[in-house]
UniProtKB/Swiss-Prot annotation:
This is Ovarian jelly-peptide 3. It comes from Sepia officinalis (Common cuttlefish). It is found in: Secreted. One of its GO terms (biological process) is sexual reproduction. It comes from the Eukaryota. Signal peptide: none annotated. Coiled coil: none annotated.
Amino acid sequence: DEVKIVLD
């Protein structure tokens, strides 16, 4: 499982 969170 892969989780990616991007905050810009």
